[in-house]
């Protein structure tokens, strides 16, 4: 599936993810993944890897420093207890990291 975020923005996000060796996979979910977002919508990200909630907050803070007009909600997938939310992420989540060949 093609990401709803422009290539240049994905490259900036991935520059943050690359600084964290513990991150294995990042998926975009929520309204941006479904294409129902508004200009005020945040960017919902689920992270797989050895990432605890405190590290997720640090990653979100680093993303907030990027020159992009978004707010970020970063969740370690392992810590998400709500089964419907986990199912939503598995169903509509769009993998944005690691980049695939020819796709950031």
Model-derived regions: residue spans:
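Catalytic core of pol beta-like nucleotidyltransferases
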Residues: 1-25, 34-39, 48-104
